[in-house]
Amino acid sequence: MKFVDEVRIHVKAGDGGNGAVAWRREKFIPRGGPAGGDGGNGADVVLVVDPQLSTLLDYRYVREHRAKSGEHGQGSDMNGRDGEPLVLRVPPGTVVKDAATGELIADLGAADERLVVAKGGRGGLGNMNFATSTNQAPRYAEDGTLGEERDLVLELKLLADVGIVGYPNAGKSTLISRISRARPKIADYPFTTLVPNLGVVSWRERSFVVADIPGLIEGAHEGAGLGHQFLRHVERCRVLVHLVEGANPEEGRSPKADYEAINRELALYSPTLAEKPQILAVTKIDVPEARAAGEKLRKAFARRKQPVEVHLVSAVTGEGMPELMDAVGRALYAEAPRRGGRGRRLGKPRAEK
């Protein structure tokens, strides 16, 4: 399933209907008074959160959204009908911004939450409203006002419990395919994952949603690589699983350096990101050199002032996966580690500046 992260749409609320100029035309009443009805109010444009939606895909193809105008007033004191609100359904986690100013309008998360993004125009008054003792036959009525019109930017932040972060090609897509039924595109080159993938993991009698966040690189906080486009998805995750490649990293890189570089990017984008609980997983330990690098990293991180829980895993053989998922489940549901486990308490990593 493709996740559309950001779309720009144009919304136009309905105009108010015009008031009517009309007169009573009844038998035996030669000089009937004014009888022009009021115009109906224009329809609002309303965003409504729909928990059944998970993407903004529909708005990629239909970007113009116009609500109906109110009907004009009529004779015999008949008012025009109000326009029915135009409801645009969006998934939970949709952030609404003004396209012209960049101003944050709302962050929509709760099911059935409603937001009026364009207010309909007010209906005009008919001439019956303007009759006075000195002017009993007003020949004018009020026009309806125009409905609001604006451009909006909708951004989707995935609502996942756990975010899997790391350098491109660290094994994130392989991991999520191993622990859930998700089947992301996987290949041996960076940026295979161009959109976030979601998987549901069953843990004991509970479940949680995992998001495979596309690869981050140095400079991501400034938009490098796939930068800002994906860092926003990390913000709502409660726990981060940080993957580092144990075998064959590029020249000049190491598992420890990768870990610190990504945490630095998280901190530069938003200080609260680097403070989220993290579990570090060294991948590809089916390769001997990766296992050795992982053991070395585990010992080094155990000596830190704030120890970081380190797991050695292989998505190919499945080794270490149950222990990793157990650690994630405990972190989410604040359970104590099982007796005899090797895991250490979760640390909140500090990015090195």
UniProtKB/Swiss-Prot annotation:
Q: Which organism is it from?
A: Anaeromyxobacter sp. (strain Fw109-5)
Cofactor needs: Mg(2+)
Tell me where in or outside the cell this protein is found.
Cytoplasm
> Which proteins does it associate with, and in what oligomeric form?
Monomer.
Gene Ontology cellular component?
cytoplasm
Q: Which family does it belong to?
A: Belongs to the TRAFAC class OBG-HflX-like GTPase superfamily. OBG GTPase family.
Protein name in UniProt = GTPase Obg
Q: Which residues bind Mg(2+)?
A: 173, 193
